[in-house]
């Protein structure tokens, strides 16, 4: 029986482990980071006590994803992992891939044939493939565009029980190996699970099919949003609302378009198909009513004049201020879809100040895009500006709160190891035009 190592013990890892348990013949081991994370420690203790994981579903249409199961072994920490594994599934955040893999033993690393990246960012495959190439010349790296849905913990005292509240309309997947048997197996599995999965020609291609890459930096790395996150506000403000209730202005939309254009220049250098941003938002993320946007404008978005592109993006955000497909109440009010409050910096269980995942994960993603652009000789002034703003907010917080214990997220010289691997990969693989 082949062995699979699931790296991560959060809701995503539990849902994926359940799928593997139900639909594959893998012997499943999981590993967390119980010595450094209170959440991971709670999960470890809960599983050891109950000897069981459980996945529940919110929508009956997804009942094939639910179940109770146990695994072969749950490791406390990565450094405790022993033995050989054919497949490693990275169910942790993309910024942890390199740091986590390098903690595995030489025996384990040399045994791995496939590494599957569940929530990668642009460039993740380069990092993982370059690192793993030291241990195996024929390593297969598979990238998904994003995780298959939304899974969360309902009760933090029972973190081994999770709830999947939704499933994405469509996923993309790409492998470093053409005619990959593993990809064929995953495609067959997706069909069984009624998940639309498109296999694309490379992991890099799959990594570009995630709208967060294009919309999170402008939404979170502007003065309005950064103030809400790092300083707080007198009244609640919301991520997806128009100014003054939220950050969305024509300036923000212009910056979104400029970043998208910079990304498209990078994609062109790799000969990766471009992303029609409006079409991706409307057809694969949150739909709008057909009366709102013209199909021709959506289809030809990439070739329209700049000002019209910005107008259409702005219209799209106004169209999802409410859920246009919800039922209005007796007063004619629709569900307030855009009322997603900003999360502020917070103290964890160890009294260390943390930056929320949005924008700390977006900082990593955007920094990697900037580095790849730099390696290709492509100028990215808008991306540079997003990063400068974010770093200035981190520094200002450090200056104002010297008495507090701050997490390493507040440092700005991060990701040097990841960047070095990208540089090496690009030097070796001259796949550019």
UniProtKB/Swiss-Prot annotation:
* Record-annotated active site: 216
One molecular function GO term is:
oxidoreductase activity
Q: What induces it?
A: Up-regulated in metal-poor media.
Question: Gene3D superfamilies from the entry?
Answer: NAD(P)-binding Rossmann-like Domain (3.40.50.720)
Task: Alphabetically list the UniProt keywords.
Answer: NADP, Oxidoreductase
According to its UniProt record, which protein family does this protein belong to?
Belongs to the staphylopine dehydrogenase family.
Q: What name does the UniProt record give this protein?
A: Staphylopine synthase
Q: What organism is the protein native to?
A: Staphylococcus aureus (strain Mu50 / ATCC 700699)
The organism's lineage is:
Bacteria, Bacillati, Bacillota, Bacilli, Bacillales
